[in-house]
Amino acid sequence: MVIFLHGIGGNKKNWENNLPFFSKKFLSVAWDTRGYGESEDYLGDFIFEDVLDDLKRVLDYFDRDKAHIIGLSMGGQIATLFYEKYPNCVKTLTLCDTHFGLSNLDKNEVKKFINSRKEPLLNGKEPKDIAPFVASSLIGNMENKPAYEKLVNSISLLHKESYLKTIDTSMRTEHRHIFKKIDVPTLIMVGELDTLTPPSMSLEIKKEIKNSNIIIIPNAGHLINIEEPEFFNKNLINFLEN
């Protein structure tokens, strides 16, 4: 079983160019994190502990003890935290465009992240209003119009209040300490042109995870599975099969 976890501006449809490929060989599942896509909103704060239990219930629903967990950006954060809580449920980890925790990003990137996403929404804008600018800051090659349009659509569909709560929780949640504990095969993938979580950050993560490999995907930014799906699929299937 393979489970795909989207990022902070995404939903399960972000994996539409990947699921059919992996479904040929694996039970393949993509979810909407609580407060995203078709999942319901919730009362109170966004709490990762609740999300980890949600993910465990996905395995239980399909009657699986273990799964290959693939997470992009915040999805990588969830995957890492899930490993800490449920290590025996993880066959392999794939961490895509992943970080140490948003608060550990470059200070200018953190400021840009908050200014472009949180502040406009608090000042009355809707996700669709910020979608074009945010998408252009994440995409590696603006000539890749299909990827850009998919990303704009994804951001436009965000649940505003849930998104704001998720930003707050992600900003204050650290998970770097977990990397040294990971004891399953781990693939790290990152876009060559990713400015939010650059290759240098993924190389640092690789140093901390034993039995890990890294692949830098050319001509891609922060959404490698959307920007370069064929390259992404080929490298991930090679990892999962070997």
Feature annotation, model-predicted:
Residues 182, 188-190, 194:
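Short beta-strand/loop motif that positions the catalytic acidic residue
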Residues 220-229, 233:
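Catalytic histidine-centered segment of alpha/beta-hydrolase-like enzymes
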Residues 80-85, 91-123:
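Flexible "cap/lid" loop of the alpha/beta hydrolase fold
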Residues 50-67:
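Conserved acidic catalytic loop of the alpha/beta-hydrolase fold
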Residues 105-111, 124-180:
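Conserved alpha/beta-hydrolase catalytic His-Asp/Glu region
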Residues 199, 203-223:
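Catalytic histidine neighborhood in serine/cysteine hydrolases
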